[in-house]
Swiss-Prot record:
Entry remark concerning the domains of this protein: Exhibits a tripartite organization, with its C-terminal part forming a homotrimeric 28-stranded OM beta-barrel (OMBB), its central part forming a long trimeric coiled coil that can traverse the large periplasmic space, and the extreme N-terminal part forming an SLH domain trimer that can interact with the PG layer.
Name of the coding gene: slpA
Annotated ranges, domain SLH: 24-84
Cellular component terms per the entry's GO annotation: cell outer membrane; pore complex
Any one Pfam family match given in the protein's UniProt record, by short name: SlpA_C
GO biological process, alphabetically ordered: monoatomic ion transport
Keywords recorded for this protein, A-Z: Cell outer membrane, Ion transport, Membrane, Porin, Signal, Transmembrane, Transmembrane beta strand, Transport
Record protein name field: Outer membrane protein SlpA
Self-association and partners: Homotrimer.
Function of the protein: Plays an important role in the structural organization and integrity of the cell envelope, bridging the outer membrane to the peptidoglyan layer. Appears to be a nonselective channel.
Subcellular localization, as worded in the UniProt entry: Cell outer membrane
Molecular function terms, GO-annotated: porin activity
Length: 917
């Protein structure tokens, strides 16, 4: 009996240790180490399993389930004891029997403690694995809970916004709902009364004796109820009328609001008042008097209210003069106002038979400068207001799915294709553009007409049309025609009428899944060979992409000949390509003119590895000479240009390791550079090497905010006809925040080592610097800033060239203090001091060449002398003070420039007030 009890308890504990619910039949795996125990307990009725026939061995055991198991076990034990004729309780035993049982137990050998060790170890492993899984699930659940909390907050915010939007609607809706509910109740009462009347009528018609109605209500009660019902009906009718009026009013107001939104009128602009005085003395100062110009730049020292900005649009402010002129105190006032509308409604006139919602939209600009003091007795002086109509546009829905829109004004722009009549960046002149969409075959018909350059006396007009079709998704077709020339015989007394310039073209594109195909043909009669065509194709399948092209762009394809004002870049043949100082594309023509050829490129990726390759071959159609920052390129007709190369990249942990090999050939011979087929300042080069780069902005960055590059390049040298020029560059930058202090150090090392027979020089540049700023949470809200940058270039050998050897140096330091709250709110004061020094420069220090002081990819600060020592030296030093209260600014600056020993001093004072509205 005792052994049976121990066996049953051991089996129960085994099941409990694994958690109740190992599968009874269907979900208990065959060969499971606890399968025998489960089946034994199930056979004895201790374990019954779940109603679906499963045991669920991986679920936890509840206290209720444990109580039930123990209860069934005790019942089983009692039954077996009773079967053996033994009392089921220990109380039924006599003391001598208990003593005998105790003696018998003591005499028996001790059983081995615990369970089988292998089973226990397996049990512990399973428990540990379950614990780890539970911990992981708990952590994931906590993260999910945090995300759900954040999402709940966002949802609550959105609910708040929606509640605010619904508040006005609900205010009226509640009142209307209450009226509706009252009407429903009244209708129910009426129906109930009708039912009662019908029942009474049946009783009367059937001869039944009516009940004593007096016990329910007297006549006076009935009369009172009737009077109340009549009053309610009257109120209901009145309320219904009010609701109807309210609904009509709401609908009318909604229509008026929609009309006001469509007809929104916006006025914006600015009023600028400036008083300024400029003084300068020294050899490089301008002569005194009105109309004199500044002579030297101070943007290299610090930003200021005296900066003339990027006047030439080359992306640099250091090459624009800010000080050095002499002018008396001058006050300038400029009022600029812009009027713009939403889409205004319109009606036909006369008769107003048809109305056109959202028909018209336009904008106006007005500018008035230096109005002067007005004398009412003479009406002088008077100043004209320059009123400019930027653009007037409208869209008319002429029929279902058909629209007609047109626009006109000074700023109207239009574009047919990249080669034909591309004038969407630079307006070609005053005129109008009309666009009709008939709603058939995805068609768009565009017409243009205008005066080139507005009223400039040349009497030249342009007119053109374009039809574009998109019959199905992914397929587009287009045709363009445009002319420009004299209109009638205006501007000439000649009896003969000169022929206009005519340009036309057709284009098409197809996109079917991963395959894309596009092409264009264009022609102009403005010059010989002013025509061309190209075809482009590309395929992308996963990480593999292939692109190819064939082009034949004539030498006469220029911006002027194609009536494309956006083709204004002077760097490239035909003036195609280029971007503005803000990075906006001026013209996106895909290929350079004066070329016939083809090209192909491909790339493939496999995990962290990417492989790229290209091949391009072209023939020069006519003699050309192009000069850019890479040098002068003199090509003759029928010259053959070939370029090919490959590159492999390996990305890991924010790093990219690259290896490359590139070849550029002219007439079959390798050369250092050839121009690419693209209309931009770009070249194909002959070189090979490797580069390791770390991107601090990458999510996988090993060190966030650390940008680092190490590059080795072996360059081809035309003088030696080999890869004899070695180039090594290591550079980087880092941004470090230490509480309120921010540090941005940078550094660059660059060396070039050419062969003795090369015309290139040997030089080494070391460049370094740091910018620091700190904002303190103290009275007056002070903040400090400072920066220091320097570079030293050693030109050690001219080799077989003409470069001058020696040292080129540049350095710059600046400090600044700003009080964000000076004396009172919205008042701030700032003081700066800075100095820039250079020697061995290739241009006078009066102006810079480019702004590259903090650039890690440039060898210089502001003067681009690198491979040869120049003869210029000097310095620019100055200080600047400004006080600002709202839009009122007082600014003062003094600066000294030492230009090759010639000392010039400049100073300026300015008061400015600008209001924007």
């Amino acid at each position: 009996m005792k052994k049976r009890l121990v066996t049953l308890l051991a089996g129960l504990l085994t099941v409990l240790s694994m958690g109740f619910g190992l599968a009874q039949f269907s979900d208990v795996p065959a060969g499971h180490w606890a399968k025998e125990a489960v089946e034994a307990l199930a056979a004895k009725g201790i374990i019954l399993g779940f109603p679906d026939g499963t045991f669920r061995g991986n679920e936890n055991l509840t206290r209720y389930q444990a109580a039930l198991l123990i209860y069934r076990l005790l019942q089983q034990i009692e039954e077996e004891l009773k079967t053996q004729g033994t009392s089921p309780t220990m109380e039924a035993l006599a003391p001598e029997d208990l003593e005998a049982m105790i003696a018998e137990l003591k005499a028996q050998p001790m059983p081995e403690p615990g369970m089988d060790q292998a089973a226990l170890k397996d049990l512990m492993d399973r428990v540990e694995a379950a614990s780890i899984a539970a911990d992981t699930a708990l952590a994931q659940a906590q993260q999910l809970a945090e995300r759900l909390d954040a999402l709940a907050q966002d949802v609550e915010g959105v609910k708040g916004d929606l509640a605010g939007l619904r508040s006005q609607v609900e205010a009226n809706a509640d009142a209307i709902q209450a009226l509706n509910e009252l009407a429903v109740l009244l209708n129910q009462d009426v129906l109930s009364l009708q039912d009662r009347v019908t029942a009474l009528e049946k009783m009367v018609s059937g001869g039944q004796e009516l009940p004593d109605l007096e016990q329910f209500a007297t006549k006076e009660d009935v009369a009172a109820v009737q009077e109340f019902a009549a009053a309610l009906r009257s109120d209901l009718v009145g309320l219904s009328e009010k609701v109807s009026k309210l609904e009509g009013t709401v609908g009318d107001l909604s229509g008026k609001v929609a009309t006001l939104q469509r007809n929104a009128f916006t006025i914006s602009g600015s009023l600028s008042l400036n008083y300024s005085v400029y003084r300068a003395w020294g050899p490089d100062a301008s002569a005194a008097g009105p109309g004199t110009a500044n002579t030297f730049d101070i943007d290299r020292l610090f930003s200021s209210k005296f900066s003339t900005g990027d006047g030439n649009g080359n992306g640099s402010v250091g090459d624009e003069a800010d000080l050095g002129k002499n002018t008396e105190g001058v006050t300038n006032a400029t009022l600029s106002v812009s009027f713009s509308t939403g889409k205004l409604d319109a009606a036909s006139d006369p008769g107003k038979l048809n109305s056109y919602p959202g028909l018209v939209q336009f904008s106006l600009r007005a500018k008035l400068t230096n109005p002067g003091k007005y004398d009412p007795s003479t009406g002088a002086p008077t100043y004209p207001i320059n009123l400019t109509l930027d653009e007037f546009s409208s869209t008319l829905a002429v029929a279902k799915d058909q629209t007609l829109s047109f626009s006109f004004g000074r700023s109207v722009r239009s574009k047919f294709t990249e080669y034909v009549f591309d004038n969407d960046y630079n307006s070609r002149g005053h005129g109008f553009v009309a666009t009709y969409k008939p709603g058939l075959l995805g068609a768009t018909l565009t017409g243009v007409y205008g005066s080139k350059g507005a009223n400039n006396g040349d009497f030249t007009y342009f007119r053109g049309a374009r039809l574009a079709l998109s019959p199905v998704e992914g397929i587009a077709l287009g045709g363009s025609f445009v002319q420009e020339g004299l209109d009638a015989n205006q501007g000439t007394t000649s009896a003969s009428f000169p022929a206009p310039t005519t340009v036309y073209g057709v284009d098409a594109s197809v996109k079917l899944g991963p395959v894309g195909l596009a092409g264009e043909y264009f022609n102009s009669d403005a010059a010989p060979n002013a025509n061309g065509y190209y075809v482009k194709a590309d395929v992308a399948l996963g990480s593999i992409s292939v692109a190819g092209n064939y082009r034949n762009i004539g030498a006469g394809v220029t911006g002027a000949n194609m009536l494309s004002g956006d083709a204004t870049s002077t760097l490239d043949q035909g003036g195609w390509g280029g971007v503005d100082s803000s990075g906006n594309v001026i013209n996106g023509a895909p290929f350079r003119s004066n070329r016939q050829g083809f090209g192909v490129s491909a790339s493939a990726g496999l995990g962290p590895i990417t492989v790229k390759g290209y091949y391009d071959s072209s023939t020069v159609l006519a003699n050309e000479t192009i000069t850019n920052s890479y040098g002068a390129f003199n090509y003759s007709a029928n010259n053959q240009l070939v370029a090919y190369g490959g590159q492999a990249d390996l990305a890991f942990g924010g790093f990219t390791l690259s290896g490359f090999y590139r070849i550029a050939q002219l007439n079959g011979s390798t050369t250092r550079y050839i121009l690419t087929e693209k209309p931009a300042e770009a070249v194909y080069a002959s070189e090979y090497g490797a580069k390791l780069a770390h991107d601090g902005a990458s999510k996988d960055a090993l060190v966030p905010k650390l940008n680092f590059t190490a590059a080795y390049t072996q360059k081809y040298d035309n003088a030696t006809s080999g890869f004899t020029t070695q180039d090594i560059a290591v550079y980087g930058s880092y941004e470090l925040a230490l509480g309120p202090l921010t540090l941005k150090p940078m550094g660059r090392y660059h060396t070039q080592d050419a062969a003795a027979a090369s015309t290139s020089s040997d030089y080494t540049t070391v460049k370094y610097g740091v910018a620091a700023s700190i904002a303190l949470d103290l009275p007056f809200k002070p903040s400090l800033s400072g920066e220091y940058y320097a570079r030293s270039t050693q030109v050690t050998s001219a080799n077989s060239g003409s470069s001058a050897t020696g040292t080129i140096s540049e350095s710059k330091y600046a400090v600044g203090l700003k009080l964000g709250e000076f004396l009172f709110k919205n008042s701030s004061v700032e003081a700066k001091y800075a100095s820039y020094t250079g020697s061995g420069l290739n241009a006078p220090i009066l102006l810079g060449v480019a702004d590259a002081a903090s650039s890690t990819t440039s060898d210089y600060l502001y003067n681009n002398a690198v491979s040869s020592v120049g003869s210029n030296r000097g310095s620019v030093t100055g200080w600047y003070f400004t006080w600002t209260y709202w839009d009122l600014t007082f600014a003062y600056v003094e600066a000294d420039v030492n230009n090759n020993g010639n000392q010039t001093h400049g100073q300026a004072f300015k008061i400015s007030y600008t209001v924007k509205f």
